[in-house]
Amino acid sequence: MKIRVINPNTTASMTDKIGEAACRIAAPGTLIVASNPRSGPVSIESHFDEAISAVGVIEEVRAGELEQTDAYILACFGDPGLLAARELTRAPVIGIAEAAFHLATLISTRFSIVTT
């Protein structure tokens, strides 16, 4: 199985750390491909940054489709471009924020988000 883990910002050092973390927990035989867009914000701090980064996510999913990627993970709390990415592929596209929210609702009926 090939999983493309997409860092929606352009910070390569962060992408490397994300890829390393994913590789540590991946099942044997799973290929993790960590990627980030060629252009876009170095950090996603505003609605504008989120909108620009969504374009990069779309480009990364298109590239993944050419490589026959089996699943995608958006490694950014805001899940930028999540719904658009799902329209481009039949493969699962999981946003880490959405996944965390779903898990939180299994633990409790109420939860909070603490951010800076």
Where are these regions (language model features)?
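N-terminal glycine-rich anion-binding loop in soluble enzyme alpha/beta folds
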Residues: 1-58, 116
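Short, ordered loop/turn segments at secondary-structure junctions
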Residues: 10, 37, 77, 98-99
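Short, glycine-/small-residue-rich phosphate/pyrophosphate-handling segment
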Residues: 13, 102-116
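General beta-strand structural signal in soluble alpha/beta enzymes
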Residues: 33-35, 73-74, 93-96
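Short acidic/histidine-rich motifs immediately flanking catalytic phosphotransfer sites
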Residues: 64-72
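Acidic/His-rich segments in extracytoplasmic proteins that coordinate ligands and/or metal ions
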Residues: 70, 78-88
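Short, acidic/small-residue loops that bind anionic groups at enzyme active sites
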Residues: 86-108
